[in-house]
Amino acid sequence: MIAPGPRATDHDTDVLVVGAGPVGLTLANILGLQGIRTVVVEERDTLIDYPRGVGLDDEALRTFQSIGLVERVLPHTVPNQILRFMDAKRRVLAEMAPPDARFGWPKRNGFVQPLVDAELLAGLDRFAHVQVRWGSPMTGCREDADGVNVELGADGGNVGDGGGDGHPAGLRARYVVGCDGGRSMTRRVMGVSFDGTTSSTRWLVVDIANDPLGHPNSEVGADPERPYASISIAHGIRRFEFMIHADESDEQAEDPEFLTRMLARMVPHPDRVDVIRRRVYTHHSRIAGEFRRGRLLLAGDAAHLMPVWQGQGYNSGIRDAANLGWKLAAVVSGRAGDKLLDTYDMERRKHARAMIDLSTMVGRVISPTNRRVAGARDLLVRSASIVPTLKRYVLEMRFKPMPRYEHGAVVHANPGRADSPVGTLFIQPRVDTRDQQDVLLDDVLGPWFAVLCWNNNPRKILGETAFANWKALGARFFALRPATQLRWTGHDDPDVVVVGDRRGDLKSWFDIHAESVLFLRPDRCIAGACIAQRAPDLSAALFDALTLTPRGGDPQSGTGSVLYVAQPAPESSGAVAGPA
């Protein structure tokens, strides 16, 4: 590992992340891989050791792959988990079992959050320039022209000024990212609104070890008598959720006898379960008025809250980290202008709002306690399932909003064209190179920008000037070919990696798109796409739109183009054990 060189700066760190939850830890890993000095401050003394989120999607696993930790995360997951919606008689109303893995991973995965979070924390041990400070709540901050002075409570983890004697410590950063949850102090300091609604409906949530059911899947019971959920997590843990009626108090719901009555509907011996924890929850549908104000930004629950019904709260936060991480790295390292950070809100807000709306709508469909309303819903759902296209729409989760950026760090050559791939995630099939066989595409592309050409040499298509600019930025270049042409050396270029289309997935993608040249961002979103002859013009437009600089970084103000190679994470002294 190459350490960052000395820099002329009065900043204690480049980025200060408030909150050591999954979003903050993922963001810190992304920044760590890019060589960005990062400090994570957390008011708790350690990670939360009980499950909260219960579902990972394919995009989250792809992000964990990008930070070199997916192999450590996978042992704590249940891949290809089926979710069934049941009526009052426990007959299947609908089923979600999406079969495709276009982004390289299953779309639905159960997981044990404390153990996955512990792997994210352990991943930071790879980076000498990333630190985590426990017992260090942010109590305030003051922004000026080139940085933010942050006040930390307690001893501030002995960072910066003060500390060690009970007095507040200070820390100066170039940017601050609040990943500090729904009650975010960062959001309050920013003076940003958090508009939306809080449901009046309460739910008893209980996690149980030694799963009394034992099957690998999950179900949601749309029972008007009492809606419920039963979710297989992993490692023998099952979550049950039961709606609490208006005439039942929180104290009643937390009584062990109440839980026994609820579980009696599900298991034969409800008094013989190993409860990890039980809590009463309400669901929130809220979004911050701004995700960025000056040098302060918000991510995860600090930026948006949504009901649990699509399992997208955790995953939406990971999307935030993936979108914001590379942009912060580019700006801090001198490879892009500060305006690039404006595209974070521009891109993430619309999709987060769509996820909130979908989750809220699903909750309303599941939760009616009026039998006539529930009966009408059941009839409608069953009628829809008779139509094959509608059944596939639900089964394959086609209703899930996918990120598609119309504005932001993208260039649309033909704005408004419905079939344009620009602003969407590129697929991740398994491919071959001359050195590796049967590997996921992202593992070949690396962690930064990538220029892909089907059936052409990127240098010849871009021209020497554009090629040199992307190379100076740290981008990599790839010639995509049918597998039959992998070993042909006629157009070899020392700066271009030849990729063989192992199963024909890449050709199938290009079969339905006119574009043959793709500019991929580090988060694997397609920043621009065009036919070969337009590549030089699109390249120039992208440098302008993303405020990129071809010099590849200023060593006085950033880390340049130094990247850290992801190594296996050693055991971390900060990691916590999950429930048995």
Swiss-Prot record:
What catalytic activity is recorded? 3-(3-hydroxyphenyl)propanoate + NADH + O2 + H(+) = 3-(2,3-dihydroxyphenyl)propanoate + NAD(+) + H2O; (2E)-3-(3-hydroxyphenyl)prop-2-enoate + NADH + O2 + H(+) = (2E)-3-(2,3-dihydroxyphenyl)prop-2-enoate + NAD(+) + H2O
What does the record list as GO biological process? 3-(3-hydroxy)phenylpropionate catabolic process; 3-phenylpropionate catabolic process
**Gene Ontology MF, one:** 3-(3-hydroxyphenyl)propionate hydroxylase activity
Instruction: Please describe what this protein does.
Output: Catalyzes the insertion of one atom of molecular oxygen into position 2 of the phenyl ring of 3-(3-hydroxyphenyl)propionate (3-HPP) and hydroxycinnamic acid (3HCI).
Residues passing through the membrane, by range: none
User: What are the record keywords, sorted?
Assistant: Aromatic hydrocarbons catabolism, FAD, Flavoprotein, NAD, Oxidoreductase
The pathway entry for this protein reads as: Aromatic compound metabolism; 3-phenylpropanoate degradation
Q: Out of the domains of life, which is the source?
A: Bacteria
Family, according to the entry, reads as follows: Belongs to the PheA/TfdB FAD monooxygenase family.
Q: Does the keyword Nucleotide-binding apply?
A: no
A Pfam family annotated for this chain is: FAD_binding_3
Q: InterPro entries under this entry?
A: 3-HPP/3HCI_hydroxylase (IPR023786), FAD-bd (IPR002938), FAD/NAD-bd_sf (IPR036188), PheA/TfdB_FAD_monoxygenase (IPR050631)
| Residues annotated as binding FAD | 14-43, 291-301
Q: Which SUPFAM superfamilies match?
A: FAD/NAD(P)-binding domain (SSF51905)
The protein's Enzyme Commission number: 1.14.13.127
Q: Which cofactor does it need?
A: FAD
Keyword Transmembrane helix among UniProt keywords: no
Q: What is this protein called?
A: 3-(3-hydroxy-phenyl)propionate/3-hydroxycinnamic acid hydroxylase
